[in-house]
């Protein structure tokens, strides 16, 4: 296949991203400053870190809407463990394991109950979110303050740069490379696509369906934990609400990136570009003085437009055939 046609959607997203940055740059010239442009990504890049493994979940025919609560649970757990005197490196490792366990719980419930993944992860979203609030209350970390007092070396980590590139953005780029290789260059990635197209056929073809699903959900949970650690480092405090605003932008990024919500198709590169597109949209509107409520409404509208547009694109032949029949009937 012609590379231009194969990556036409990704190329369109890249062009739209450049246009978006230039458009917001005309409104607020500060956004065109390379340092402002790079360091502003730290405010939203965790959306992209979670969107990458979530792409694999959606391509497999699944769904996970509990990652925001997982971020909050992992963040407050990190704070509580540190507050109890645990060495920070060990607390971070346990936090990452907790994120993976949250993903495994999702996968286990989905596989062994056969209930729609959206319903299961809706339940675990409240389970993890409630657990985070309970843990926060027990630790006396209610409100916006959370748990602070982290070492300067840790709080500086998400605010420093390497070769002029912010550390969270470097994490995102590394994750992009890892998940792109995993999704598009390995047997596991091929299995994810086949499961999304037909889980039953994949099972009859001796593809390890359950193991693959456990892996992609665990990676989403682990990515949520990584996002939690970066957010705690960035803000300097551990709070149970750190992932509260992640749901809509992250799912919008995955769908806008080209993932079919019914499974079977998707692109890591597309999700990465779409995450930047959604992030800079929010950032640009904020710098232009637009209220957060309007920014959220625009993100929701963008998601609806993309879903409807892709649905029309997928069924364009049936639509054209129906239109042709109607026109012929009128002419007759």
Swiss-Prot record:
Keyword Plastid attached: no
Main location group: membrane
Residues annotated as transmembrane: 7-27, 45-65, 70-90, 91-111, 118-138, 162-182, 216-236, 240-260, 261-281, 288-308
Cellular localization per UniProt: Cell inner membrane
Record keyword Transferase present: no
GO cellular component, one term: plasma membrane
Membrane topology of this protein: Multi-pass membrane protein
Keyword terms, alphabetized: Cell inner membrane, Cell membrane, Membrane, Transmembrane, Transmembrane helix, Transport
Quaternary organization: The complex is composed of two ATP-binding proteins (LsrA), two transmembrane proteins (LsrC and LsrD) and a solute-binding protein (LsrB).
Purpose: Part of the ABC transporter complex LsrABCD involved in autoinducer 2 (AI-2) import. Probably responsible for the translocation of the substrate across the membrane.
Protein name (database record): Autoinducer 2 import system permease protein LsrD
Native species: Salmonella typhi
Gene name of this polypeptide: lsrD
């Amino acid at each position: 296949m012609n590379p231009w046609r194969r990556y036409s959607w990704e190329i369109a997203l890249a062009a739209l991203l450049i246009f978006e940055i230039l458009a917001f740059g005309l409104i607020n010239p500060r956004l065109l400053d390379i340092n402002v442009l790079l360091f502003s990504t730290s405010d939203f890049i965790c959306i992209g870190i979670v969107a990458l493994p979530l792409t694999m979940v959606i391509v497999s025919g699944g769904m996970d809407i509990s990652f925001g609560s997982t971020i909050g649970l992992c963040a407050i757990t990190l704070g509580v463990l540190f507050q109890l005197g645990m060495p920070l490196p060990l607390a971070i490792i346990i936090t990452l394991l907790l994120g993976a366990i949250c993903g495994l719980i999702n996968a286990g419930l989905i596989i062994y109950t056969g209930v729609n993944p959206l319903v299961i992860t809706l339940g675990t979203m409240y389970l993890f979110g409630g657990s985070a609030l309970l843990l926060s209350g027990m630790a006396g970390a209610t409100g916006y303050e959370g748990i602070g007092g982290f070492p300067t070396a840790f709080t500086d980590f998400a605010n420093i740069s390497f070769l002029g590139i912010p550390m969270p953005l470097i994490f995102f780029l590394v994750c992009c490379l890892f998940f792109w290789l995993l999704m598009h260059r390995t047997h596991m990635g091929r299995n994810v696509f086949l499961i999304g197209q037909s889980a039953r056929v994949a099972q009859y073809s001796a593809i390890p369906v359950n193991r693959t699903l456990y892996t992609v959900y665990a990676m989403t949970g682990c990515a949520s934990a990584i996002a939690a650690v970066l957010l705690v480092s960035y803000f300097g405090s551990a709070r149970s609400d750190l992932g509260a605003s992640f749901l809509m932008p992250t799912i919008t990024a995955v769908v806008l990136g080209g993932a079919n919500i019914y499974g079977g198709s998707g692109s890591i590169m597309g999700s990465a570009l779409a995450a930047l597109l959604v992030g800079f949209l929010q950032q640009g509107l904020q710098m232009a003085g637009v209220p957060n409520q309007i920014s959220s409404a625009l993100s929701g509208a963008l998601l609806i437009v993309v879903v409807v547009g892709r649905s029309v694109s997928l069924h364009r032949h049936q639509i054209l055939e129906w239109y042709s029949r109607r026109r012929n009937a009128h002419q007759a």
